[in-house]
């Protein structure tokens, strides 16, 4: 029985969150009418000259730093030539010879087993137009042409579909945490191309690889890799050649389809972009690009708060939720996380929206929990209070009073109510000497019912025990 090793390399394109395009001053607006956000530079008119987007360069440096890469201080661009309708210039401006970042790595954990993914390069380039294929024709929207991209290319070091999914998800979290990209597979702001081959275990040579393009979910990445591995194994045992092909996954059947078979290496005729001179990136400029807290640093911080794993993973999976949580100044983060997820996130889920879209002022969440700590309100009242904080900008204490959410802590008032309960339920109370827990539970339950759950439970418990003990002195 021959054991095989899977060899996987991944190319990820991330769409950068800049206001304008990579080489033109055109505003990026994904909601604009088709072909209204493209100018002569984007469309390749003769005589136009590209201008490099400074923000995109900063984002690339930031990502290179996050991935521990060597940063090229000479910013240089090249032309990649090919003919296709989505590329009106006949070439794409990219960085073939001199990528802005080289030789980085990211450490990952697969069920307790740590491994490192070596990244060959990251480079800046421009996106192409969006294609809409109909039955008998195709439509092109050049609004996307020229949008800044960073391509991240690994060495062929991944060995399974699980490792590939972990890597893509890790890059997603990095770019979202850095806030340089939306990093969403489902909308195409992060696009993954997977290169797969197999070889006998121990072999050092590479066989023909199959490239699977534009995978738009972790589920599809896993399905595509596992199907392709099975296909290549079957070809090996049938003594058939694995053709160098480009494939895609069919969204309906979730099966692979061949787009084209490569019979020769494509000559893209790369050469330096003559209209963009070398740009020297000074040490001062590179050092001015600061990193934000990275996902693994954020994870360590949350673990120091003793957050449970469900809350921790929810925060790490959604940078916007994490930012909202972090904006709440309440100091006990463990207690905060329990209330935040039980009340705020649950409220958002009931409305089928995100917690950070509820428009609840983070400072009001802190004030509400402080009122709970001060025993001004009860846990039950807090549950009623949180929905009232949506769009609320005024005095939270007044809101509590207006809605009768204050906790009853007056010992005299509580004592009088308990004495009345004991008086009107004398037959049951007679059992107290022999069945203390049952009677006490009844009295406290009746007290909560009569007061709408507004009584301070600690004070109520002490007074109830004292009152019952006095009856049987």
Swiss-Prot record:
Signal peptide start-end: none
GO annotation (BP), single: glutaminyl-tRNAGln biosynthesis via transamidation
E.C. code: 6.3.5.-
Protein origin, superkingdom: Bacteria
InterPro entries: Asn/Gln-tRNA_amidoTrfase_suB/E (IPR017959), Asn/Gln-tRNA_Trfase_suB/E_cat (IPR006075), Asn/Gln_amidotransferase (IPR018027), Asn/Gln_tRNA_amidoTrase-B-like (IPR003789), GatB (IPR004413), GatB_Yqey_C_2 (IPR023168), Gln-tRNA_amidoTrfase_suB_CS (IPR017958), Gln_synth/guanido_kin_cat_dom (IPR014746)
Catalytic activity from the UniProt record: L-glutamyl-tRNA(Gln) + L-glutamine + ATP + H2O = L-glutaminyl-tRNA(Gln) + L-glutamate + ADP + phosphate + H(+); L-aspartyl-tRNA(Asn) + L-glutamine + ATP + H2O = L-asparaginyl-tRNA(Asn) + L-glutamate + ADP + phosphate + 2 H(+)
The entry's keywords: ATP-binding, Ligase, Nucleotide-binding, Protein biosynthesis
GO molecular function, one term: glutaminyl-tRNA synthase (glutamine-hydrolyzing) activity
Record Pfam families: GatB_N, GatB_Yqey
Keyword Aminoacyl-tRNA synthetase found: no
Record-stated family: Belongs to the GatB/GatE family. GatB subfamily.
Quaternary structure, from the entry: Heterotrimer of A, B and C subunits.
PANTHER family: GLUTAMYL-TRNA GLN AMIDOTRANSFERASE SUBUNIT B MITOCHONDRIAL AND PROKARYOTIC PET112-RELATED, GLUTAMYL-TRNA(GLN) AMIDOTRANSFERASE SUBUNIT B, MITOCHONDRIAL
Role according to the record: Allows the formation of correctly charged Asn-tRNA(Asn) or Gln-tRNA(Gln) through the transamidation of misacylated Asp-tRNA(Asn) or Glu-tRNA(Gln) in organisms which lack either or both of asparaginyl-tRNA or glutaminyl-tRNA synthetases. The reaction takes place in the presence of glutamine and ATP through an activated phospho-Asp-tRNA(Asn) or phospho-Glu-tRNA(Gln).
Protein name: Aspartyl/glutamyl-tRNA(Asn/Gln) amidotransferase subunit B
Designated gene of the protein: gatB
């Amino acid at each position: 029985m021959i054991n095989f090793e899977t060899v996987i390399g991944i190319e990820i394109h991330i769409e950068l969150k800049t206001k304008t395009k990579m080489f033109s001053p055109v505003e990026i607006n994904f909601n604009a009418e088709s072909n209204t956000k493209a100018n002569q530079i984007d469309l390749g008119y003769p005589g136009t000259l590209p201008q490099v987007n400074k923000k995109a360069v900063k984002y690339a440096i930031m990502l290179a730093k996050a991935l521990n890469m060597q940063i090229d201080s000479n910013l240089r661009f090249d032309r990649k030539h090919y003919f296709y309708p989505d590329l009106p210039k006949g070439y794409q401006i990219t960085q073939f010879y001199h990528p802005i970042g080289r030789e980085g790595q990211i450490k990952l954990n697969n069920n307790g087993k740590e491994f490192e993914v070596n990244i060959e390069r990251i480079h800046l380039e421009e996106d192409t137009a969006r294609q809409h294929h109909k039955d008998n024709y195709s439509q092109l929207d050049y609004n996307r042409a020229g949008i800044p991209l960073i391509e991240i290319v690994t060495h062929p070091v991944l060995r399974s579909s699980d490792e590939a999914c972990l890597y893509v998800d890790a890059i997603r979290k990095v770019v979202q945490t850095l806030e340089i990209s939306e990093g969403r597979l489902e909308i195409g702001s992060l696009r993954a191309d997977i290169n797969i081959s197999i070889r006998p275990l121990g072999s050092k040579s590479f066989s023909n690889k199959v490239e699977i393009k534009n995978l738009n979910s972790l589920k599809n990445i896993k399905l595509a890799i596992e199907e392709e591995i099975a296909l290549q194994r079957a070809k090996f045992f049938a003594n058939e050649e694995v053709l160098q092909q480009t494939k895609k996954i069919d969204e309906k059947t979730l099966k692979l389809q061949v787009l084209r078979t490569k019979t020769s290496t494509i000559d893209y005729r790369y050469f330096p972009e003559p209209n963009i001179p070398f740009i020297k990136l000074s040490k001062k400029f590179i050092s001015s690009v600061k990193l934000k807290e990275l996902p693994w640093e954020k994870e360590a911080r949350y673990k120091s708060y003793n957050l449970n794993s469900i809350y921790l993973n929810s925060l790490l999976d959604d940078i916007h939720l994490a930012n909202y949580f972090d904006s709440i100044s309440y100091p006990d983060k463990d207690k905060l996380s329990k209330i935040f997820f039980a009340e705020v996130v649950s409220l958002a889920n009931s409305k089928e929206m995100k917690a950070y879209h509820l428009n609840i002022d983070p400072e009001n969440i802190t004030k509400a929990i402080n009122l709970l700590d001060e025993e001004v309100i009860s846990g039950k009242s807090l549950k009623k209070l949180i929905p009232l904080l949506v769009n609320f900008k005024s005095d939270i204490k007044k809101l509590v009073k207006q809605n009768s959410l204050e906790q009853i802590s007056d010992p005299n008032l509580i004592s009088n109510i308990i004495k009345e309960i004991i008086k009107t339920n004398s037959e049951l109370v007679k059992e107290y000497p022999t069945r203390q827990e049952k009677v006490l539970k009844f009295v406290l339950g009746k007290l909560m019912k009569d007061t709408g759950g507004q009584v301070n439970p600690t004070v109520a418990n002490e007074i109830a025990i004292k009152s019952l003990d006095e009856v049987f002195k």
